């Protein structure tokens, strides 16, 4: 009887990456539905893996929350140069990017509490968001200013804080409310030709 041939390292690594990506996608969806305090078993069930697989990849809830948001932050940041290259105008690129940023913000049930928690694993999450997304927004604003589509004095940090404040949700708000308010803010920034 022959010994089974072990899978090549590359195959195992690719499978591990697919599992990790599936867990991140499942966690992201569960966090939208239930918030960041959702039971790990719900995430495992949605990902089609065991709870042990989650803990093997993400030993603490903070590790999982950080990985999910890091992935989403990186995706949002990478969208900026892509939109500049593909959009009819820099302001169109900014508008689409801001829509993606708003979607990121309004689906983060419990993120505010997580950012304010004493968990040392979450302490750098807000800084990560700013360090990654402010430069992406600045790139778009600079292109808009160069095309004379916005005033050159608009700070990316200030615009993002204003958007963030408009996206604070409560029992009387819906996602559409945040989108309408942010659209009004952007309309005020726009300098039509």
Segments from the language model and where they lie:
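Hydrophobic/aromatic residues within well-ordered alpha-helical segments
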Residues: 19, 72, 76, 90, ...
């Amino acid at each position: 009887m022959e010994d089974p041939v072990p899978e090549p390292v590359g195959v195992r690594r690719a499978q591990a990456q697919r599992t990790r990506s599936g867990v991140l996608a499942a966690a992201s969806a569960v966090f939208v539905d239930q918030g960041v305090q959702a039971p790990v078993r719900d995430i495992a069930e949605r990902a089609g893996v065991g709870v042990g697989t989650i803990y093997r990849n993400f030993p603490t809830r903070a590790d999982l929350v950080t990985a999910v948001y890091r992935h989403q932050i990186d995706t949002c940041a990478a969208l900026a140069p892509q939109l500049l290259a593909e959009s009819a105008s820099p302001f169109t690129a900014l508008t689409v990017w801001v829509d993606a940023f708003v979607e990121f913000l309004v689906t983060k049930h419990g993120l505010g509490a997580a950012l304010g928690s004493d968990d040392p694993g979450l302490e750098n999450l807000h800084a990560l968001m700013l360090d990654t997304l402010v430069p992406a927004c600045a790139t778009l604003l600079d292109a808009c200013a160069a095309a004379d589509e916005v005033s050159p004095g608009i700070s990316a940090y200030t615009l993002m804080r204003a958007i963030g404040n408009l996206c604070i949700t409560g029992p009387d708000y819906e996602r559409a409310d945040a989108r309408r308010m942010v659209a009004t803010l952007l309309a005020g920034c726009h300098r039509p030709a």
